[in-house]
Amino acid sequence: MFFSDHGGVQWLVVFLGNPGLKYQNTRHNAGFLTANVVEKDCGVHIDRLRFHALTAQAELGGQKVLLMKPQTFMNNSGEAVAPAAKFYKVPPEHILVVSDEIHLQPGRLRIRTKGSAGGHNGLKSIIACLLSLIHISEPTRRVVIS
């Protein structure tokens, strides 16, 4: 089930990790491991290659969501996220990124709506690519990240 292309998705949920068996059960693949649980619990298969990512569309909580597992390496995750956000016209505030966090104990969760990448290269890549899209498409718009 794929929603109508442009504007058919309201949210992006991005599960960060590194592709390949070598990284399968490493800390950096916390996002991919979480995606596996979501697949099982929601009965979806994140397996359609699109935007340099494995993707699936789902309706969660009445919202149309694109689930993504970028197939770029962690440091280049923005190369998958930005084109999807642009294609579906999803604003940055509707992008949820699931990643590892070295400052949290396993099993702990933190949700942030503001802040920096905190040294996480995958988040840095996503922020940089999204800012690049904003500056290209809306050169007069000012973006502040605090």
What does each model-found stretch correspond to?
Residues 117:
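Conserved TIR/SEFIR loop-to-helix hotspot centered on a Trp-containing motif
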Residues 2-114, 123-124, 128, 134:
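Nucleotide and nucleotide-moiety/phosphate-recognizing core
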Residues 134-146:
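Single conserved hydrophobic/aromatic residue that forms the stacking wall/gate
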